[in-house]
Amino acid sequence: MCRLMLTGLEKVYRDKKQEKKAVQNLTVSFEHGVYGLLGENGAGKTTLMRMIVGILKPTQGQITYDGIPIRQLGGTYRNLLGYLPQDFGYYKDFSAVRFLNYIAALKAIDSKIAKERIDNLLETVGLTEARNKKLKTFSGGMLRRIGIAQALLNEPKILILDEPTAGLDPRERVRFRNIISALGKNRIVILSTHIVSDVEYIADQIMIMKQGAFIKTGTQAQILEPVAGCVWKCVVSEKEAEELNATYAVSNLRGSEREGQVE
């Protein structure tokens, strides 16, 4: 099993007035499985992912795959990657099939192989019936699913997903998590988000990022162990929720099935 290794990785942005460390001295290794990169907006998640896929060059440190620096691997490494950025470009008047064929051509995939993969991927992401519809008619959830499909066209060994559930409704979010969970069995999947529920049930490892550094890493059980017995879930009125939110550290609020109440 090949390993993706980040060693002493840093990214510094400089201008005439100041410098900002977007990523600070990260060392971590990835093998097959789903890795949840959790952190608020601006924590450095996107910068880290752009370095992993080779869009950004680290200021310091290195990234290796199977012991070889990715800069030396060049196109060989890029062929191992599948990438879904937070905002990915597409031609609005293309149908789903035409768009995926276009991406397959860019990735130099043989047309016969591409046809079979596209059919399989559309089924995997639940878009078979929408295959001939134009992308401009797709909902946000459908676009994220076609984004997953394009990232998987080259059967990547490393799948990078940057805020893949952004803007999705709860039902689409669940569907997306189910898709991602199945993908980590034979590849490295790195998923970034600022929403805890996106990773708590599907990630083999969770990495919490703040100000460019990892402040906590481990399994879900390991992450939650220090707060065992200190977290409660309850159903309260909206007024009580406001009072509790002002007094305690509330991690999540959502509407309850009971009218006028929240969980």
Describe the function of each predicted region:
Residues 61-77:
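Conserved ABC transporter NBD signature motif
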Residues 40-44:
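Walker A (P-loop) phosphate-binding loop of ABC-type ATPase nucleotide-binding domains
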Residues 101, 105, 112-130:
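Conserved ABC ATPase "signature" region
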Residues 1-6, 10-25, 31, 73-74:
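A short, flexible loop at the N-terminus of ABC-type nucleotide-binding domains that lies
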Residues 159-162:
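Catalytic Walker B motif of ABC-type/P-loop ATPase nucleotide-binding domains
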Residues 53:
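Helix-to-loop junction immediately C-terminal to a conserved catalytic motif
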Residues 176-262:
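ABC transporter nucleotide-binding domain
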